[in-house]
């Protein structure tokens, strides 16, 4: 059965160096972060080379909201648990992810705004200030959604959310590529990385 709740002590035990399974746990955690970073490296490459990101704009705003919340949650957890190394490490890693998301949001606003929102305008051109307003509005909504569902899911340290974000990554980009009907901004290599990352999430 899926655990209805979990505590910081369980995480600390799993990632304490006295745990005989620490090697396995670190390997899986390391692979999880590696796949996550690779998914964004592909996004960087595609948006720079093809001027089109592989993920829809709402995924960027959602992941920014999720990861910025995680930065705060893990930093607080570290301070409440004798500066346990994993909590500080996770908080720092999520800061890096936030920087990735800022880059993607910047490119969405300055390079992709017509492709993203152009259908809403008669001439297909999206004013820069409108793009900024849409992104900021989405960010506010997503931050609210992430924190509201943390309460609903009884998810004090974001680990249930992490599983959901990996499932979302496995589903949403493929649907987005299919709707766009083009390989521009998509990649077979990225699809393979997403599949492997999703499998790793459930090991």
State where each predicted segment sits.
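Alpha-helical membrane-protein topology signature
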Residues: 1-203
């Amino acid at each position: 059965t899926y655990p209805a709740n979990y505590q910081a002590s369980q995480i600390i035990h799993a990632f304490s160096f006295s745990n005989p399974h620490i090697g396995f746990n670190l390997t899986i955690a390391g692979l999880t972060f590696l796949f996550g970073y690779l998914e964004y490296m592909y996004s960087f490459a595609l948006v720079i080379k093809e001027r089109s990101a592989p993920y829809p704009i709402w995924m960027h705003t959602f992941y920014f909201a999720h990861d910025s919340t995680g930065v705060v949650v893990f930093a607080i957890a570290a301070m409440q648990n004798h500066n346990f190394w994993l909590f500080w490490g996770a908080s720092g890693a999520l800061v890096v992810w936030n920087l990735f998301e800022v880059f993607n949001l910047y490119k969405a606003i300055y390079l992709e705004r017509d492709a993203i929102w152009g259908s809403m305008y008669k001439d297909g051109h999206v004013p820069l200030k409108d793009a900024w307003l849409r992104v900021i509005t989405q960010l506010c909504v997503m931050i609210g959604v992430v924190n509201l569902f943390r309460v609903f899911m009884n998810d004090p340290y974001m680990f249930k959310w992490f599983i959901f974000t990996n499932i979302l990554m496995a589903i949403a980009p493929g649907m987005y590529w299919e709707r766009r009907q083009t390989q521009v901004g998509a990649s077979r290599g990225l699809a393979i990385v997403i599949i492997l990352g999703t499998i790793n999430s459930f090991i």
